[in-house]
Amino acid sequence: MTERYADKQIKLFSLTSNLPIAEKIAKAAGIPLGKMSSRQFSDGEIMINIEETVRGDHIYIIQSTSFPVNDNLWELLIMIDACKRASANTVNIVLPYFGYSRQDRVAKPREPITAKLVANMLTKAGIDRVVTLDLHAVQVQGFFDIPVDNLFTVPLFAERYSKLGLSGSDVVVVSPKNSGIKRARSLAEYLDSPIAIIDYAQDDSEREQGYIIGDVSGKKAILIDDILNTGKTFAEAAKILERSGATDTYAVASHGLFAGGAADVLETAPIKEIIVTDSVKTKNRVPENVTYLSASDLIAEAIIRIHERKPLSPLFSYQPKGKNNA
């Protein structure tokens, strides 16, 4: 969608964490970004000013709560408050990446469930809806008492790999850890490919002695995960696949954080190409073999469908050309 969207009572605002994806979303939706300013005082306090009226409007605030997580989260909370006090009709937040979603349970005694705390804070601030992309744990949706639309990136990845000819029985989709089996199976079903899993002994904290459940010998392997942080999970998994006879290894993740040193780790790993979405804007160096796949069209269409009260279900599937839609 490139023409100006007709309904001017919907407005998009971008905060500072990921302006590039916000600009793409705005262009795809045909809705220009609203005018606002955000600045940080010397003591760290954040000041926001909305530079146009939002009275009676439906507001969508775009912000990834990635590094620096707490600054970006507080900027979002302050913007929500500004919109509420300016008499916006509804305030909706678009989180291409939802920080703290990995803290979704008590893994050890006396640990907090910070994902629930953040959900409470956002809800209490006054939001009406959340649009996000590939939550680390889907149960985080249940931490909110408002609608949460968790969009999936697997259909985007399936379309990309199908165009590259990476599908069928010569390809195997691999989960680099047993917790990602569902994600791997989803991509494998789109590609008509088998799956494999890399598992580790409980005392293998460095993940160096993994073993493969499934057949990868003589096949092209696609590693899939939701968050690429330090790169160690993909790097070690790729080495295991190479030792096990995989001919080529590709990797794909929804969110490319690329924490310090990740580029060095991944560039020495036997990975042909790494695909991530543009959900996170990082200041760290990115490996040379990384390809960015934009999720902006997907998010833009979701925003328009929500505003027009249309179902989002068509966004959760990818139908390869030549397949019967019946």
Swiss-Prot record:
Give the record's subunit note.
Homohexamer.
Give a yes or no for keyword Zinc-finger in this entry. Answer: no
Q: Name one Pfam family in it.
A: Pribosyltran_N
Give the cofactor binding note: Binds 1 Mg(2+) ion per subunit.
Task: Write the protein's name.
Answer: Putative ribose-phosphate pyrophosphokinase 2
Protein's organism: Streptococcus pyogenes serotype M18 (strain MGAS8232)
Detail which positions bind D-ribose 5-phosphate. Answer: D225, N229, T230, G231, K232, T233
CDD domains per record: PRTases_typeI
Q: What taxonomic classification does the UniProt entry list for its organism?
A: Bacteria, Bacillati, Bacillota, Bacilli, Lactobacillales
Principal subcellular localisation of the protein? cytoplasm
Record carries keyword Cell division: no
State the similarity comment.
Belongs to the ribose-phosphate pyrophosphokinase family. Class I subfamily.
GO BP field = 5-phosphoribose 1-diphosphate biosynthetic process; purine nucleotide biosynthetic process; ribonucleoside monophosphate biosynthetic process
- PANTHER family the UniProt entry points to: RIBOSE-PHOSPHATE DIPHOSPHOKINASE FAMILY MEMBER, RIBOSE-PHOSPHATE PYROPHOSPHOKINASE 1, CHLOROPLASTIC
Gene symbol here is prs2
Task: Please list the residues that bind Mg(2+).
Answer: H136
